[in-house]
Every structure is written in C-alpha cells, then in structure tokens.
Amino acid sequence: MTTYKIRLDDVDSTNTYLRHLEHLPDADVVVVTACHQTAGRGMGSNRWESEDGKNLLFSLMVRPEGVPVARQFVLSMAEALAVKAALDTLTDGLSLKWPNDVYWHDRKISGTLIETSISGKFVKDCIFGTGVNINQQEFRSDAPNPVSLRQITGRDTDIDMVFDKVLEAFEGYYSMVLAGEYDRVAALYHDVLYRRTGMHAYSDGDGQFMASVVRVDHDGRLVLRDEAGRERKYAFKEVNYII
C-alpha cells in the first residue's frame, strides 16, 4: 500500500486543501499534515482548537474500490480504530465514542470530520480530517472536555512518531476494508466503544433518559436500549451524551 505525504506549515483547513488539490498523487492513501490550521473544522459549526505546533493535525484521503454506500461507515470505523491503536501504545484508558471520537475516560483526545463523495452505489473517495491533542497543556475554548496526551502522561511526545503510528495502523484496518472484511472491522469497533457496558445518561428531543449501547448499525446509526427495554436508533446529532 502506497502513501503520499504533503506537509504544510500553515493552512486554512487540511480537508479543504486536500479536496481542492488539482492533481491528486497516484497513491492508495494521500495525507496532508499542518502545524497550524486557521479554520480547522470539527462537526457542524465547531472549530478544532490547536496551539501552533503542539498537536497532530492531518487529513487523509482514500479512494476505495467496491465499498457500497450502505456500508460507508466501515471507513469511519477503520480510521477511528487506527487513531486509537496509535494512542494505545502511549497510554491506557482509551475508547471510541460514537461516531469517531477517541476518548480517554470521559475526555476527548481526538476527533475526526469525514467528507465522503459518492459515485452511483459506491464510495468514490473519503477524506478524514483528524485532530489529535498531543502536547497542548491548556485549552481556552468552550469545548466541554478536551484532554491532551501531555496532560495524561506529564511529558511531551514526538508528534511525527504518533503520526507514523496512525498511518501504520490505518494501513492494517484499511486493508481489511478493501478485502471486504466489514464485519471484522465492525466487531473490533464495537469491542472498544465508549460506554459499551452498563446504563448511562443520554438526552434527545424528548428529554433525558438512561440507556445501554446495543450496537452501531451498518449505516452508522447508534442503537440504544432504554430502561423500558425499547430500542432507540439515532443518527449523529440526534442524541447527546450526558457526561
């Protein structure tokens, strides 16, 4: 598997840069990293807070062949698993909060914005814009629960080393996707889900409730079971975690 890397000092958004690149390199994986993003995006209207040179910021593009639109969430699972696997070598207590955040206990260490292009019934390409909090010691935005590797371990970590670990892990999980091993990737994802056991607090348009995680469906919807035994299915942003 071939990977083409582009390194930038400063950019508005690595996702935007990669999406508008005129001539895409002929590689299985194309990735752009930046020391600083002036408009790094999170989900919706959110912005990813990052002190210059302190964190890992990258966008990764793949052009998979044969991944059906109905199973496109497997790509999100694979990338999230790769980020977690890299961080697993540096600390413990990590899990994946649906849909693709990496959590250390109840705090967010990494998040990803995904942009997918479709061609007919299949995925044409997919861009993962990821931020991983590495060496930042203080967060000033109103983000509710950020944490960095530096805050966890008490020491600085080489950012390029973390990046190499992510790419190495991604190659393994992405190879599973290309081989059609969607259920295998999904099983690995479910095994490390945040709140995968027990009853926890959530809220939706009808108010707050207690529920347990049942599964994440192929289409990426989260399935919860409330105290009455009723299954509730949610797309992203339709349910909130009460942390």
Question: What do these predicted ranges mean?
Answer:
Residues 1-89, 156, 231:
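N-terminal lobe of the biotin/lipoate ligase/transferase fold
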Residues 65-70, 74-94, 104-243:
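Long, positively charged amphipathic alpha-helical accessory segments at protein N-termini or as interdomain linkers
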